């Protein structure tokens, strides 16, 4: 029966090629637009390596500090290593807490007597590679002993390894980082710039440089950010409460100097962090969600309403056919079943076209569509299927269009 319905649906589409093409194109447009908008949002919050645990991340990229002599003024930016350790590294509830430089810095890397190339270097602690799941192709990350000793070692990407050594098998080899010798301990898959917290091309221990001394406000502010890996999303409330207590305790120590650290309700989860652009402003998550919902509704409703009208018109053209078939014994359920199948065929064909166009557009327009408003690197963002494709989103959009196509016929039409 279903096979027969399917054949009849295809035959009906061939009988009205213009209407069929317009219906498929309109539904494909709706799928294309909603998928493209969702992709733009998903790259900010959806998990992909090396940030596969985004649903368990809490971030403290920046904070503010005030002083009794500054009035209402504040100093805003990343924190110092000391502040990060005193407040966040000491937390007991999370699975892991990593401290790292808030942004990568373009630095020359080379081999002796060879021309240098630019690489984005991020300085981290050893826990960084426990929080972020890098895919190692050679070697391994530096461990706690190496980090504490300040040994000049580095983890590099495949592209940097090939540029320097001609292959990805470079663990144990040495190169010059800003004219200082470093030894490669591991090689990882290239990381997209869309992985904002973990992106880099070279990662080194911040104990191997003088970065911890790059501070201000009496060593309370500096160049460091923190990412917390919770054991479960359910622990977020407890982690935030513990962080508040540690902040309060630390501020009581700073009171003698006249300073007060301000977290602005940090740490933020991944979704909140994705819309946070300033250290001294707390993002409005409800407003951002409301704006996205309005955009989604508009993108879905405008094409769908037009398609619904077209389906209604097509059914009215078939009133005589429906009457004859009812007169010869066709039941209401059989007629409704055929209408549903016709709409399902249209939706599936249009969905495949819309999904294909959205993926092609995302790949071809990566530099424009996924360009970050604030970025410390000149490297263009890269995307792959693990970043772009989320079947649940496509299925929801497909179901929505199908429902709107189906709801156009009224019972009296059958």
Describe each model-derived feature in a short phrase.
Residues 37-108, 115, 222-225, 372-382:
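Membrane-proximal extracellular/periplasmic loop immediately following the first transmembrane helix
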Residues 5-14:
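A short amphipathic helical element positioned immediately N-terminal to and/or at the very start
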Residues 406, 413-414:
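Single conserved hydrophobic/aromatic residue that forms the stacking wall/gate
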Residues 15-44, 283-320, 348:
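Hydrophobic alpha-helical transmembrane segments of multi-pass inner-membrane transport and secretion
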Residues 125-141, 152-282:
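Mid-to-C-terminal secondary-structure elements
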Residues 372-405:
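Conserved transmembrane alpha-helices of multi-pass membrane proteins
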Residues 18-29, 320-366, 392-408:
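Transmembrane alpha-helical interface segments in multi-pass membrane proteins
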Residues 101-103, 110-141, 147-148:
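The feature marks short, hydrophobic/small-residue-biased sequence motifs that occur predominantly
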